[in-house]
Amino acid sequence: MAPEAGATLRAPRRLSWAALLLLAALLPVASSAAASVDHPLKPRHVKLLSTKMGLKVTWDPPKDATSRPVEHYNIAYGKSLKSLKYIKVNAETYSFLIEDVEPGVVYFVLLTAENHSGVSRPVYRAESPPGGEWIEIDGFPIKGPGPFNETVTEKEVPNKPLRVRVRSSDDRLSVAWKAPRLSGAKSPRRSRGFLLGYGESGRKMNYVPLTRDERTHEIKKLASESVYVVSLQSMNSQGRSQPVYRAALTKRKISEEDELDVPDDISVRVMSSQSVLVSWVDPVLEKQKKVVASRQYTVRYREKGELARWDYKQIANRRVLIENLIPDTVYEFAVRISQGERDGKWSTSVFQRTPESAPTTAPENLNVWPVNGKPTVVAASWDALPETEGKVKEYILSYAPALKPFGAKSLTYPGDTTSALVDGLQPGERYLFKIRATNRRGLGPHSKAFIVAMPTTSKADVEQNTEDNGKPEKPEPSSPSPRAPASSQHPSVPASPQGRNAKDLLLDLKNKILANGGAPRKPQLRAKKAEELDLQSTEITGEEELGSREDSPMSPSDTQDQKRTLRPPSRHGHSVVAPGRTAVRARMPALPRREGVDKPGFSLATQPRPGAPPSASASPAHHASTQGTSHRPSLPASLNDNDLVDSDEDERAVGSLHPKGAFAQPRPALSPSRQSPSSVLRDRSSVHPGAKPASPARRTPHSGAAEEDSSASAPPSRLSPPHGGSSRLLPTQPHLSSPLSKGGKDGEDAPATNSNAPSRSTMSSSVSSHLSSRTQVSEGAEASDGESHGDGDREDGGRQAEATAQTLRARPASGHFHLLRHKPFAANGRSPSRFSIGRGPRLQPSSSPQSTVPSRAHPRVPSHSDSHPKLSSGIHGDEEDEKPLPATVVNDHVPSSSRQPISRGWEDLRRSPQRGASLHRKEPIPENPKSTGADTHPQGKYSSLASKAQDVQQSTDADTEGHSPKAQPGSTDRHASPARPPAARSQQHPSVPRRMTPGRAPQQQPPPPVATSQHHPGPQSRDAGRSPSQPRLSLTQAGRPRPTSQGRSHSSSDPYTASSRGMLPTALQNQDEDAQGSYDDDSTEVEAQDVRAPAHAARAKEAAASLPKHQQVESPTGAGAGGDHRSQRGHAASPARPSRPGGPQSRARVPSRAAPGKSEPPSKRPLSSKSQQSVSAEDDEEEDAGFFKGGKEDLLSSSVPKWPSSSTPRGGKDADGSLAKEEREPAIALAPRGGSLAPVKRPLPPPPGSSPRASHVPSRLPPRSAATVSPVAGTHPWPQYTTRAPPGHFSTTPMLSLRQRMMHARFRNPLSRQPARPSYRQGYNGRPNVEGKVLPGSNGKPNGQRIINGPQGTKWVVDLDRGLVLNAEGRYLQDSHGNPLRIKLGGDGRTIVDLEGTPVVSPDGLPLFGQGRHGTPLANAQDKPILSLGGKPLVGLEVIKKTTHPPTTTMQPTTTTTPLPTTTTPRPTTATTRRTTTTRRTTTRRPTTTVRTTTRTTTTTTPTPTTPIPTCPPGTLERHDDDGNLIMSSNGIPECYAEEDEFSGLETDTAVPTEEAYVIYDEDYEFETSRPPTTTEPSTTATTPRVIPEEGAISSFPEEEFDLAGRKRFVAPYVTYLNKDPSAPCSLTDALDHFQVDSLDEIIPNDLKKSDLPPQHAPRNITVVAVEGCHSFVIVDWDKATPGDVVTGYLVYSASYEDFIRNKWSTQASSVTHLPIENLKPNTRYYFKVQAQNPHGYGPISPSVSFVTESDNPLLVVRPPGGEPIWIPFAFKHDPSYTDCHGRQYVKRTWYRKFVGVVLCNSLRYKIYLSDNLKDTFYSIGDSWGRGEDHCQFVDSHLDGRTGPQSYVEALPTIQGYYRQYRQEPVRFGNIGFGTPYYYVGWYECGVSIPGKW
């Protein structure tokens, strides 16, 4: 064996020789070459003997010992080659006894000779010391642990085999032996067989039983160049002989085998529906790592089936793209290797189905010709699409007048139709016809345009056309083919009726498109509608026709139609800008998405555009068209953007909607419109009854919209009569419900109409807007076919919109849902550019790309403008009346303006509004008519409010209609409010992106465009106080500046506030206004007020957080839209607000919080984004604290409200310190929730002079950095900062919100908490806490200890007083720096979290720390610490280090002593820490309680900046100089840097050593360096060491901008990225570890008693959390419901882009505020929205947010995701005892003729089983070389996965299962677990999602 081993080493030796010779050649020192030869040869005759004392090694010296002297011998031994111990013996020794060996264990021994020139090659031996007992395993005796049974007589057990020899080759070992002695047949020791074992170590052996006659055996498929131990035993019935061990080294593969290898790992990746990429591994190249030039590969493929013909491709590369395949077909692929003349064997076949795709070609030979004798009819024919394009679902024939491409209409025909008649054309016109096909996967391309000229005729009467439209409905069936009728049943009537209707519609539109006559989509409805509409206006018929047309597509391509419909409204919005077609076009841009889908929408819009009246009618027509297409489209676009034209038209149609008290006039209009819509709806419902019978509720919003659609007057009427609107909505609802049932299109249409009329109208408009915008979008998509411009946008929008609309429709609490959904979608769907183009107000959308909400919110603001307050009030009253009518409200929610902005600002909205929107939802809380704006805004109330708001808004709208934008904004606002997202959005809009809104928005806020775009001129004027450009800003600011002025005026001052605060300022101001008085209460936050009860502390705080979040959100909307919102929110808020401008500002914020409905939004709104949520949690606490402070320093407070909340109340206590403290606190920004305090920290305040906002932001950021800290320490920075703090908070929050929300601390480097932040605790302003008491709500309160049971019976002590987790030995859990991990009570009062907010102990008492969060804590840091979202690793346990505390500092006895290193006075860590921690979360009512760790000068005077300060965009932070002053660029804009930078540079202070017994990371535990109040905290920075973003670090921007495929990762303000080790598999479980477990049961008990209403607000701050490198899942996170709402659960809706445009949503329920969405496809856009529910029903739906998944990892999956392995749901038999997963079960067939079964924990964690047969039992898999990591091969992953739980094979029960040793090895069946070398696990994470299909 030695020679063989030596032989195997020759190759390496040659290599070294070559290297040495090369060196010799290069270095002209010949002697070196000679010297290199002097290393010794290997020792000879090496023997390894087993003795009682151990293992004895003997050897002889090597040859040539004289010429190559040996200086010493090296002996290495161990159980495996990976764990060897080394011993050196001198050259004169030739034997050695190894004593420290375990009996019965196989040891490898390596012997080498060494001298100064080198080492010989090793000689390997293996043997096991005597001892151990024999046990039977797998039917064969195997040596196991335990003493050897010496009593067994040798007479019975056979002797061991003789002369065992092992020969090795590159991948196999040949073993030969002689029979043992005395083994004859008659011998008592005869052998009945042999047991051969082999493996890479003694404990991981594979055993092969052999017959007694065998004398050789070959072990195949081994790894080359590896050392194996081989054991051989003879056995008989009595037992086995002693084993004989040999060690052998497999050789390098050198010579090419005669037989060519078979390719491995063939993978087929779907590239498109017609192409796949086949790749494979060439085993030779893999092993030799060199390319063989003559090697060729042949790929063969065919359709599945034995008779199919093979196609071949030959290539020299190891991958090939195979194209021209047939979609939706299973193909078989195989590969072989060829070299020279030789061909290898074909590999096993791999099967892959090509995905079905949308048609890739258009129908050919489209021919259109006039029908003789019928000047209005043409016949069309086309060729059917080939089968290769998939089964055609329907054909969509689009046509438009050649000179009016925006008036496009579409008719749909069943897939088997190839001809059609189109009626209703204009004689003498030239028409463009195009056709496209659709299948289940989507729309195909358009054919080339075919132009046909209609013969002239005297008959072209619009009325006749209208009648025709009505008639054609009947004739539809008579249209060219029955299909046409079928389609006509749907939106598209048969060709003739539809065409005719379309034409009539066009005419109607041209003549009087009222866009409201949302006639039923169906032809019949149309017929009726035509008449009814005629009564109302022919427009309705037109719309009806459109609707019917669209409808027809709806049934077959309902979604498309809807999309189209959606589009037009957007378009309408734009159109509205000008009466002429241009306006339409402008609108069209909004509609672009939709345009492709629904040309009809376009034509409607276009035709009305021709003249101002037509424009007016057009707007209605648009509505109609949208309505026809989709109720929502028409409403939103036309109204909002049509304000100018539309307003005129509306006024005409509706009376004068805008100028008049929209209420009165619109109402009257409404009644008729209502009637008409009702009838229309009815018609529709009759037409479309079957389509969506279930959508009545959903449709209600539509119905409302439809009613509005029914006539131009309808919108006004809806607006004007609060009751009417509401009533209308309600009545419409019934009708709508039928229409909704019809297909939701009608519903959509109706909303569209509403939108039109109420585009100024409040909610109805808003909702309609949303709907219509949605519809429009979809319409736009269809229309886009006709129109070249904006098609993509439109289509997108349309899809989105449609999805939204449908969702809305589908929602039972449809009113709200529709609106909400529509709104967001509209915003989304709309093409922003179009919106902006559409009209000046369009800017609104730009300002709030989330235009739906923003525009809404803004309008609301304007409508609430000072001039409109009464309106609002009146409205408010009405709203309250209407309140009960959620549907109405919903419709109202979607104002067209809102909608329009939505399209453009949707994304932004989605970001900011989402938060904002969710805030909005809460916003509705305010019911005070007082604040006019607020009233409208209240959408929080939204149903009723919305209705009222709608009325108000309508009047406001009418009012604003004068400034058409204003009216729109008003309605938008209103809508937004009801649709809460919009309001929030709008608010945030003003402040800009929602993320921005919190902190940054303010800066942007100043950009009036936002406001402008948001409000339109009208809104601006409404917001007289705020500048037109700042309408929205003012909104955001309103909360803040409130001190300057109440109402609008406050908005103007608000701008800076808003900016400083981001959206928050507005919220603050509103809060101020809302809750001036309330602010006084210590519960600074509105929440505080509500939640104020200290008893609630944590809960209150949390509630506060949630409320404040909502309120804040709302307030931001309110702030601009002003105080209105806020005031609305706080019924008295508006009055209070004015009174409270100065002082209460921060308070206002609190009040806003306190006033659950009203103030909430303001304070939170800024946070509206997820960040807001995080912030909101923080904010809540902070707001509580900040607000309290705020009372003192209104401005500051307001901006810092949360943070300073304690300051205000506390402020009173602390006098100078209070403010400073509070400001400091703001800096600390205790994060109630997750301990996001650190993250919450605001940047240091800018210099006192700097704007509060700026300062606020910086202050928040600075805490992180020492420099920042220093400003914090400075009085001026803090005070300002305080003022600003909330804004800063917001500003940071925007990004932070989600993360913060996730972990609160996660945002910023959690580790480096605001290092600069003074270590002051609550009581300290750099001095000891005089009060010594902890805030009631503070965590300090949970004094005491809790014992929890850890894994494996371990016990842990949670010491809440000291903030530690200890084990029985007194060792404490430590952080990544070896310091004690600080813990506190979570916001839910049950979860124990670290100061970063990362859960450490679950509410059920389960530990969440340790290795992978499932093991026992470690004594020292792990290699890869688990990081909370804040970035802090959880390390393990360390004995508490006793550090010298500063002599002066003594810790409070209760707390572990954590003297502040610099601080002279130790802070009682307990109270302080706890409090801080808690304070943030809990309401820190007492000023003393909240301590801003950020240093705040005791003397802090809170300057209240009077001018808004620009802030940085979301994702970036302001730069501050050493003094904490904001660094401004030459152009007056603050210098910004990426948010992440903050972690890196600013955290230097973290390096400061901590003198305390434990490092306190929490803000609370700010390093207790006492710094003079005025001193900057720099010296104090002994804060936590700066943390480098580690695994789990959270950021709104991905660490890597590009994914593995080189695509840019999707970035948005509401998107947060977690990073992970690129080599680790994706783990949903790990990602979820970053989320705090929020418990609803804490809120429910009290609230259930209070209310019997369904949730009144939509969830806010929706954030999408993605993990870099993981495309298959995201975690949707959102803010809790407003405190007033009782929420027992949530529904999360998700849809891919294709589903979104079809309004096809998947729904999942969640009991907490986050939910993972799994099995997402790569490179795909998804949409998400959330809805709260309780036992009384469902609340409104949040606006949707979108996210684009990243590319798949091309190196991960063996087969492509598009053609991922087909996992079949199948419940197989298995033993569930040994799995950690108990979810759904899937199976798939594998290439190795086994069935793989998986039981899911989640899509990325599962237990893998194998079986030979589907019906047999499935077994676990064992691994003798590892922990099953390579079993990921069974689920087609190339990755070595992670497995768990970690254990030892001895702890695993012995079970039956499959086992193998290495990847690619065939599995064998036997026992695994204890007593075997085969380890099995309870779960696997392989990075591959199962089932992998979304």
Swiss-Prot record:
Almost absent from healthy skin; especially in epidermal keratinocytes, skin fibroblasts or endothelial cells and is barely detectable in benign melanocytic naevi. Expressed in the stroma close to skin tumors, in the tumor cells themselves and in the epidermis of psoriasis. Keywords: Glycoprotein, Phosphoprotein, Repeat, Secreted, Signal. Glycans are attached at N149, N1661. CDD domains: FN3. Residues 1-32 form the signal peptide. One of its GO terms (cellular component) is extracellular region. Residues 1071-1088 have a biased composition (Acidic residues). The modification Phosphoserine is found at S717. This is Fibronectin type III domain-containing protein 1.
